[in-house]
Amino acid sequence: MPRRLDASERASFDQIPTTDLERARLVCVPVLTPGIAGMTLDRWMLLRRGHEHDRDLIAHELVHVRQWRELGVVRFLARYLGAYARGRWHGLGHRAAYEAIPLEAEARVVSGR
């Protein structure tokens, strides 16, 4: 069942714009791709069961909520998938190509993850 972040959670993420804290919906899911603890699609933060209280992961996914809002669906996906594809094209393995995506790098810096 999707849920909003509660007031204490919102207060703890002062680096995230209020608009995105209010828009975000956290969904605990039983399964994601192996090795993935969280994934964001627009305002929907999908967190693997057992990670729904991981503050650093939530902060990371909240950065993606902001990115989706600022860029919109088409631009976000074009930048994200384009960067991943370029990394793979240039011979990077999956993990290295993922880590080289600028949107992921920004989320890691802001969240400390």
Could you describe each region identified by the protein language model?
Residues M1-T40, G72-R113:
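Metalloprotease/metallohydrolase-associated module, dominated by Zn2+-dependent proteases
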Residues E9, I58-L62:
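Structural preference for long, well-ordered alpha-helical segments in enzyme cores
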Residues A37-I58, R69, A97-A100:
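Short pre-active-site segment immediately N-terminal to the catalytic Zn-binding motif
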Residues V63-L71:
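Active-site-flanking alpha-helical
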